Amino acid sequence: MPTSHENALQQRCQQIVTSPVLSPEQKRHFLALEAENNLPYPQLPAEARRALDEGVICDMFEGHAPYKPRYVLPDYARFLANGSEWLELEGAKDLDDALSLLTILYHHVPSVTSMPVYLGQLDALLQPYVRILTQDEIDVRIKRFWRYLDRTLPDAFMHANIGPSDSPITRAILRADAELKQVSPNLTFIYDPEITPDDLLLEVAKNICECSKPHIANGPVHDKIFTKGGYGIVSCYNSLPLAGGGSTLVRLNLKAIAERSESLDDFFTRTLPHYCQQQIAIIDARCEFLYQQSHFFENSFLVKEGLINPERFVPMFGMYGLAEAVNLLCEKEGIAARYGKEAAANEVGYRISAQLAEFVANTPVKYGWQKRAMLHAQSGISSDIGTTPGARLPYGDEPDPITHLQTVAPHHAYYYSGISDILTLDETIKRNPQALVQLCLGAFKAGMREFTANVSGNDLVRVTGYMVRLSDLEKYRAEGSRTNTTWLGEEAARNTRILERQPRVISHEQQMRFSQ
């Protein structure tokens, strides 16, 4: 007789295969996740297991048997130059070759979403192969390439980088993105005041007004951590080493930790250190399975051909729910202050970020770049209820954009593997994109690592790091979607009422289970 567990598994699988809104490829993806999550979890200490079961720590539904890294950032330049013995490909000689080679390799780059989350620093990669092509000839090819990416790899966690330099490829990508207004690929422009021309940054601002992309990264800040050109911005704004990536992402629910604390002092001296240690134990267990039991790094041609290096993968030490944690702790101390409203509460938040950063910097991990994890302000997942993503301000009553940026900026110094705050601006900004440029430059001057904006009235909007069309959400439940992340946006709309709020959307990363 089938056990209750077997019956539950069959019911979940039956729900997937009979779903009227999933494509066959999407059904296959979710069925594979159910199979993986039916396997035993890597062995954990009792306290770490309890924290995971109680929801104080969340493993992002990555799966019980991590047989591939969460995020992979291949050295695409090496691939274009040398080709691949495994794929029986010669190196590229012109732009057509380069685009063709990339479209082939993308299908062999694994990730937590089963699609590539990093497409490369595309303008730097492709510009050497332009040769004698005119701008019009480049534009035609890039637009065709852009459409191909969205139609064959329909996952909005897929992420391309451009900048900081100007080039015909850079301009062609910006034009294609503004014209096509696609959900994927996502796009980050890396800004460097010593390199980026003013008119290029203005063009980037115009694109944001048009399609809420690209996200803008503060290049010099990232260069200090990874070296110039030694990193990529992927998925939901995770900054990671190039030719490596992110092995796993586990996150602390700071709200739940605050609920288990008797006072502010108890939080900082007992509960937060305790759960930080449990999170490291989970990270180590997951990475040990990936490195020692999955055989991924032993068998992948990406390793054998020098496109990735196992020593350049880093686990991400995530957190979320800072706003709720601060408010709870202030209540316990009798402090009449709210996060994002009063300086006393904001200072508690900064202290939490500083203590997390100190812990991560001083705590070795078994497997990882420089033997350390990297701190990440995680942007939430679609099923989160009652918590604010990362270190963001609570939704619904945010201050004006300048005050908002000044409030969150101090956190950015601590989160080396990514932190983001989404500003939603009135659509009147479209008449003055230079104001958007000044807002971005002011944010970077204040110390922010990233600048991200949605423009009210646009159909294409950002849900944390990835994009969805609001029009797609309305028809998804009836018709389904060819884009793998539309259902996430739809679930976020139900769970968080994002469509009922002022022009601003919640952020979340991939939820690794299907629910109708």
UniProtKB/Swiss-Prot annotation:
Pfam families: YjjI-like. Transmembrane segments: none annotated. GO terms for biological process: anaerobic respiration. InterPro entries: Glycyl_radical_YjjI-like (IPR016905). It comes from the Bacteria. To H.influenzae HI_0521. NCBIfam families: glycyl_YjjI. This is Uncharacterized protein YjjI. The lineage of its organism: Bacteria, Pseudomonadati, Pseudomonadota, Gammaproteobacteria, Enterobacterales.
